[in-house]
From Swiss-Prot:
GO terms for cellular component: cyanelle thylakoid membrane; phycobilisome. The gene is apcB. Light-harvesting photosynthetic bile pigment-protein from the phycobiliprotein complex. Allophycocyanin has a maximum absorption at approximately 650 nanometers. Heterodimer of an alpha and a beta chain. Keywords: Antenna complex, Bile pigment, Chromophore, Cyanelle, Electron transport, Membrane, Methylation, Photosynthesis, Phycobilisome, Plastid, Thylakoid, Transport. Belongs to the phycobiliprotein family. The keyword Transport applies. This is Allophycocyanin beta chain. The lineage of its organism: Eukaryota, Glaucocystophyceae, Cyanophoraceae, Cyanophora. The modification N4-methylasparagine is found at residue 71.
Length: 161
């Protein structure tokens, strides 16, 4: 896992150069949004259960997926879906704090789509739930932090799609 600072420094180091204007601007932007990201992470942490509950209600609860024969039918499958959605919200929050998607590649997306496909987990419904979590989160943290978090929710969704 890296953060925005490490990514900028590593890119310059690989080229054997000092930071250029664009690199300095990336760092400046990262530091300027630091307080916003920390406040958003605190709000998400304090409301994670409510985010998951509302996202499930918006996206999955009343669809065919929860009826007998659906992929979320039985308590065990339903619990696994809730667990996975919580995992996505948590790791999207980590990525937002770091200002970098590498943790999502390393700890969430690497092999996940293949695993879901082999287990018969409906990827479309998973993406729908992630997008619902994005919407719920934005409502809690406000438009600026919501847009920032949206980057990481969308990254997960794209990686699964």
């Amino acid at each position: 896992m890296q953060d925005a600072i490490t990514a900028v420094i590593n890119a310059a180091d690989v080229q054997g150069k000092y930071l250029d204007t664009a690199s300095v601007e990336k760092l400046k932007s990262y530091f300027q949004t630091g307080e916003l990201r920390v406040r958003a992470a605190a709000t998400i942490a304090a409301n994670s259960s409510a985010i998951i509950k509302e996202a499930v209600a918006k996206s999955l609860l009343y669809s065919d997926i929860t009826r007998p024969g659906g992929n979320m039918y039985t308590t065990r499958r339903y619990a696994a879906c809730i667990r996975d959605l919580d995992y996505y919200v948590r790791y999207a929050t980590y990525a937002m704090l770091a200002g970098d998607t590498s943790i999502l590649d390393e700890r969430v997306l690497n092999g996940l789509k293949e695993t879901y496909n082999s287990l018969g987990v409906p990827v479309g419904a998973t993406i729908q739930a992630i997008q619902a979590a994005k919407e719920v989160t934005a409502g809690l943290v406000g438009p600026d932090a919501g847009r920032e978090m949206g980057i990481y929710y969308d990254y997960i969704s794209s990686g699964l799609g």
